A protein has these predicted regions:
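Short, surface-exposed acidic
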Residues: 18-26, 111-119, 174
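Active-site flanking loop/helix segments enriched in acidic
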Residues: 25-54, 83-87
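His-Asp-centered metal-binding catalytic motifs of divalent-metal-dependent phosphohydrolases/nucleases
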Residues: 51, 70-87, 100, 121-127
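An active-site-proximal "capping" alpha-helix that borders the catalytic cofactor pocket
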Residues: 50-55, 94-110
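Polymerase palm active-site segment centered on the conserved acidic dipeptide of motif C
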Residues: 103-127, 131
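Divalent metal-dependent phosphate-bond-processing catalytic cores, especially two-metal-ion Mg2+/Mn2+ enzymes
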Residues: 1-13, 41-49, 56-68, 80, ...
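Eukaryote-skewed repeat-based solenoidal scaffolds used as protein-protein interaction platforms
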Residues: 13-17, 72, 116-117, 121-124
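Non-catalytic interface/linker regions that flank or bridge core catalytic/transmembrane domains
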Residues: 1-24, 34-36
Length: 227
């Protein structure tokens, strides 16, 4: 087994070891670990850090055209985009976004405060259902929206996404699995980064995987299952 198979790079990103963006994110990570939703089934620490990780990858992709400040604004938005999320399907994601914005306003650092409006605009792009088509957004809003909708492509997606959302939505695992084919089939990436990260063959492979889970879950056991 290789070191890369067991060692994550989140500390590398938070410290900004590669000097990709302005400053570092260590202060915000410490705050994030104290958020009310770090242990939620889906809208948890793993999700918020996964979106941050993806936004870092996008920053690397666009490093020749984005400034270090623009990258930092995106990463701060990613960290806070689900801050204090209640973890329940309430049908009012605008209220969940407001919780995130309140957390940002309360904890934003002095050096980031002049860019509060830009960071807030990026966070607001993650409100679902979407009020504005992704193609009509600015590049930073497009990136965070694509990152936020792409955790299905991680290897731990069944536990994190399927089981996590089933718990938060008070649905069965099969209910959520049945949603995956239409969701993934309608997933469209508009940024060059997103298109390279998740080409259509990758999306198709994930659809087939979700279909496989659905087929197994819909089978009926013919013999009693030992307890």
């Amino acid at each position: 087994m290789k070191i890369a198979d067991v060692q994550g790079d989140i500390p590398f990103i938070l410290r900004n070891d590669a000097n990709l963006y302005e400053g570092n994110l260590k202060h915000y990570f410490r705050l994030l670990c104290k958020a009310k939703n770090v242990r939620r089934p889906y809208h948890n620490l793993r999700h918020m850090l996964h979106v941050t990780w993806l936004c870092y990858q996008a920053s690397r992709f666009y490093r020749d055209t984005w400034t270090q400040r623009q990258m930092r604004n995106l990463l701060v938005a990613a960290i806070f985009h689900d801050f204090n999320h209640p973890g329940a399907q309430q049908g009012d994601d605008d209220l969940n976004i407001e919780k995130a914005l309140r957390g940002l306003r309360q904890h934003i650092t002095v050096e980031d405060r002049p860019y509060l409006a830009e960071i807030e605009a990026i966070i607001k792009a993650t409100e679902y259902p979407y009020n504005v088509p992704t193609a009509e957004l600015g590049i930073f809003e497009q990136v965070i929206r694509e990152a936020d909708s792409s955790q299905a492509f991680s290897v731990a997606w069944f536990q994190q996404v399927i089981v996590g959302l089933a718990d938060e939505w008070e649905k069965t695992i099969l209910d959520v699995i049945k949603m995956q084919r239409p969701f993934l089939s309608n997933l469209k990436f508009v940024t060059e980064w997103g298109k390279q990260m998740w080409p259509q063959d990758v999306i198709n492979a994930k659809i087939l995987e979700s279909d496989g889970y659905r087929e197994i879950l819909e089978e009926t056991d013919t013999e009693p299952v030992p307890v």
